[in-house]
Curated annotation (Swiss-Prot):
Lineage: Bacteria, Bacillati, Bacillota, Bacilli, Bacillales
GO MF annotations, alphabetized: ATP binding; ATP hydrolysis activity; DNA replication origin binding; lipid binding
Region (Domain IV, binds dsDNA): 327-446
Quaternary structure and interacting proteins, as annotated: Oligomerizes as a right-handed, spiral filament on DNA at oriC.
Name this protein carries in UniProt: Chromosomal replication initiator protein DnaA
Residue ranges of the region described as Domain II: 93-109
Length: 446
């Protein structure tokens, strides 16, 4: 891997001479070499937009530059960090009892060097998840085991998992840390059965110190893989090895997940990550700009942060898009230029943000229920049923976590919210009167 990095660094020095400084700073400086397989050099771009731009505008120039350096005609492929994490890694040929050696090769290959605790921006939506991750990294298998982190796409779950891995390796270089997606776990498991190497597969993942497994929800419906992961989990937990799991939803909401797995995921700590608030989004943009050596006016930071509120990946992508647009038309970056650069990805009128309070008020109007009754202990049908409808709509129409929804309904447990959602979802399939009432509530909320 060191030789590939040296080659790419040499290529970057040559490319810096061939393109303008803004273009180099915007597109090429932040790239890294990932691997070289069969005359295909894979380069990591910081985000999706940068990847697409590099593919369409710089592939030929990069290929020519590499030919000048090596005399070999290499094809160029670009990936982003998320897909890099799921790339197949070329490991040394398997040998008898070599599972532990294989594990030692994985950490450096599979962890993104940019995803550390130092580069993670802490805000109200991720503060607890960050604290829990740091506690796990400082004392693996002693703080929370397993640690289960859930939240939407692009909110920092993978970043925290990689940060845990980096921290453990930094403080214990001999630690065997493995990061992979559940999809990769599934594919390797299937291949091990096909190639009659099930024992090697088990040794590989049951002889590690820290297992970081991403997107566990993709195990849903895969009975054999769930069975294998169940035994892997047990083996590691019994040996006091740390397990960290991420998902886009809490364990109880993962469909067709075996109860015995679900219960094990709940043994340790479950924490969520929610979309960043305005202050956190601005802090993320400032940190990104500083890391990339970009001089971005505060008004532009504020504009982007106000317009992009879904996730961190889109936020950083918007910043790069603005910088790229500025370099292309050779104009200084300001709020007007940012608006022009982002006009294709920002709708003219942003959809109305609906709060749990709005939902309670609308449901109360339709069912003649007082606002305070939604939080009260009353269990009469005239109150309990509208309350369940309000919980259902809160789950459907807001980004609030289950605990947050429960809190807004008088501090009820998240399982109560799940039950309400399941009940109303089922009734809506057959109850035409309920369908009309929910439609009426939705009209009020528009």
């Amino acid at each position: 891997m060191e030789n590939i990095s040296d080659l790419w660094n040499s290529a970057l020095k040559e490319l810096e001479k061939k393109v303008s400084k803004p273009s180099y700073e915007t597109w090429l400086k932040s790239t890294t070499a990932h691997n070289l397989k069969k005359d295909v050099l894979t380069i990591t771009a910081p985000n999706e937009f940068a990847r697409d731009w590099l593919e369409s505008h710089y592939s030929e120039l990069i290929s020519e530059t590499l030919y000048d350096l090596t005399g070999a005609k290499l094809a160029i492929r670009f990936i982003i960090p998320q897909s890099q994490a799921e790339e197949e890694i070329d490991l040394p040929p398997s040998k008898p009892n070599s599972a532990q050696d294989d594990s030692n090769h994985l950490p450096q290959s599979m962890l993104n060097p940019k995803y550390t605790f130092d580069t993670f921006v802490i805000g109200s939506g991720n503060r607890f998840a960050h604290a829990a991750s740091l506690a796990v990294a400082e004392a693996p298998a002693k703080a929370y085991n397993p640690l289960f982190i859930y939240g939407g796409v692009g909110l920092g779950k993978t970043h925290l998992m990689h940060a845990i891995g980096h921290y453990v390796i930094e403080h214990n270089p001999n630690a065997k840390v493995v990061y992979l997606s559940s999809e990769k776990f599934t594919n390797e498991f299937i291949n091990s059965i096909r190639d009659n190497k099930a024992v090697d597969f088990r040794n590989k993942y049951r002889n590690v110190d820290v297992l970081l497994i991403d997107d566990i929800q993709f195990l849903a419906g895969k009975e054999q893989t769930q069975e294998e992961f169940f035994h892997t989990f047990n083996a590691l937990h019994e040996e006091s090895k740390q397990i960290v799991i991420s998902s886009d939803r809490p364990p109880k909401e993962i469909p067709t997940l075996e109860d015995r797995l679900r219960s094990r995921f709940e043994w340790g700590l479950i924490t969520d990550i929610t979309p960043p608030d305005l202050e956190t989004r601005i802090a993320i943009l400032r940190k990104k700009a500083k890391a990339e050596g970009l001089d971005i006016p505060n008004e532009v930071m504020l504009y982007i942060a106000n317009q992009i509120d879904s996730n961190i990946r889109e936020l950083e992508g918007a910043l790069i898009r603005v910088v790229a647009y500025s370099s292309l038309i050779n104009k200084d970056i300001n709020a007007d230029l940012a608006a022009e650069a982002l006009k294709d990805i920002i709708p003219n009128s942003k959809p109305k943000i609906i709060s749990i309070y709005d939902i309670q008020k609308a449901v109360g109007d339709v069912y003649q229920v007082k606002l305070e009754d939604f939080k009260a202990k009353k269990r009469t049908k005239s109150v309990a049923f509208p309350r369940q409808i309000a919980m259902y709509l809160s789950r459907e129409l807001t980004d609030s976590s289950l605990p947050k929804i429960g809190e807004e309904f008088g501090g009820r447990d998240h399982t109560t919210v799940i039950h309400a959602h399941e009940k109303i979802s089922k009734l809506l399939k057959t109850d035409t009167q309920l369908q009309k009432q929910v439609e009426e509530i939705n009209d009020i909320l528009k």
